[in-house]
Amino acid sequence: MPALSTGSGSDTGLYELLAALPAQLQPHVDSQEDLTFLWDMFGEKSLHSLVKIHEKLHYYEKQSPVPILHGAAALADDLAEELQNKPLNSEIRELLKLLSKPNVKALLSVHDTVAQKNYDPVLPPMPEDIDDEEDSVKIIRLVKNREPLGATIKKDEQTGAIIVARIMRGGAADRSGLIHVGDELREVNGIPVEDKRPEEIIQILAQSQGAITFKIIPGSKEETPSKEGKMFIKALFDYNPNEDKAIPCKEAGLSFKKGDILQIMSQDDATWWQAKHEADANPRAGLIPSKHFQERRLALRRPEILVQPLKVSNRKSSGFRKSFRLSRKDKKTNKSMYECKKSDQYDTADVPTYEEVTPYRRQTNEKYRLVVLVGPVGVGLNELKRKLLISDTQHYGVTVPHTTRARRSQESDGVEYIFISKHLFETDVQNNKFIEYGEYKNNYYGTSIDSVRSVLAKNKVCLLDVQPHTVKHLRTLEFKPYVIFIKPPSIERLRETRKNAKIISSRDDQGAAKPFTEEDFQEMIKSAQIMESQYGHLFDKIIINDDLTVAFNELKTTFDKLETETHWVPVSWLHS
């Protein structure tokens, strides 16, 4: 039989061979019927398509591309769920329809299987009909690649056995579905582990690459798949598992910063939850302290740290009569609407750990969210607010404060102040109608809740600056406040940028402006540090006022995003 011509191109050789076969085989075919059959078979479109697929896979194998992510199917489900909460247009409807098609779901599932290399054969579990006197043994082979196994182990103090203590959601062990909490580990890659410490076994696993073979004795009870709905939390503190002596496995811990959004994957353990960062496409979870555990140990570890309302020096009583005008807060004495009934220790009862949150986007017919500005005296908060008001008087508004002071000839009721009697003011205080109030020279000044409602009712963004301990009481379904902390730059930058600026002085009755002093700078920095330390978990945004123009532009950009983009808010705001 003569040699067959296969063509010169290596990538298209098989395709050319297929096309040449009928002619090459013709001298060896006895009947015309057989020859016709060969021509029809090798000319079949489906066969040509299979050859093309083969060539594509051969090229893919040569390139060895690395998958961008391992959980495309889960990402598509999350995207579809997210789109359901968006205003539907033709493009979104088309995308939702596409993502719901079985063939697209199957394609993404196959992609994930290939990306995770989850196609190697795994030995099935041993049959259940084994002598009750003998322990049933399972031999499991997992492909770990470079990722952690996703399980923690411990030594049983009574029996000395090595037990699977925890399965991390989304990890290799979890995806296999073959290893469960309570299983006893006997061998790893043929190495007996009965007499080894957990640390030694971890080293064996860390040094193993590719396939790992386990010999295990199943526990008495296997985990049932969790059917919990998705739960998202906002972290209210920084966490580094490497600095946590209590965590059972530092390598399994998940680091996060204050303000990060985490998705809770499992709450089966009352002490250690499993979570992942919300924006992380990697499905593998990590350990974080549970809310109850973190609250308990913080309360025991730091009972001396009590969150007290910031004390304001006498120098800051400057312009107190003006403090509520444009909602300025350089007050000598002020109280929140809750402080008349609750002691200063009310703030200490709350240990900031986590807050359950949900996505929220303002609808066009909704009132604007209340914008709360917080910052130390002299940081430039009022100047930023003034620039905002000037930039768009139809869009931004401020509250008109109440006072018991006598109206002056050039003043109009309801413009500079709302003038009321002392008796009525005190009655409103008792009825908790004031967000904040204070007294200066035997006259009351205060910002009422109704004044905030009045601005919002005009379809305006209400700009309100308050003392930081008041913020928590404004966090309600009605106002949905967005809290911005205006932070000073370093003291070196303050000396450089504020050398010609002035601050309102209290050294004369008129509250005249005076140049900043070194003491002003130091007190501004110290006050900002205390605010951020005690109330930073309530801040949605931090803007450093190094340069006024830059800070103003950042503030404007923040407002634009606040009104058009999706943000995370407490669940209670939408489901109460």
Swiss-Prot record:
Residues 10-65, 67-122 form the L27 domain. Pfam families: Guanylate_kin (PF00625), L27 (PF02828), PDZ (PF00595), SH3_1 (PF00018). The lineage of its organism: Eukaryota, Metazoa, Chordata, Craniata, Vertebrata. Acts as an important adapter that promotes epithelial cell polarity and tight junction formation via its interaction with DLG1. Involved in the assembly of protein complexes at sites of cell-cell contact. Keywords: Cell junction, Cell membrane, Cytoplasm, Membrane, Phosphoprotein, Repeat, SH3 domain, Tight junction. Phosphorylated by aPKC which promotes dissociation from the cell cortex. Belongs to the MAGUK family. It comes from Homo sapiens (Human). It is a peripheral membrane protein. This is MAGUK p55 subfamily member 7. The phospho-regulated basic and hydrophobic (PRBH) motif is sufficient and important for interaction with phospholipids permitting cortical localization. Phosphorylation of the PRBH motif by aPKC inhibits the association of the protein with the cortical membrane. The gene is MPP7.
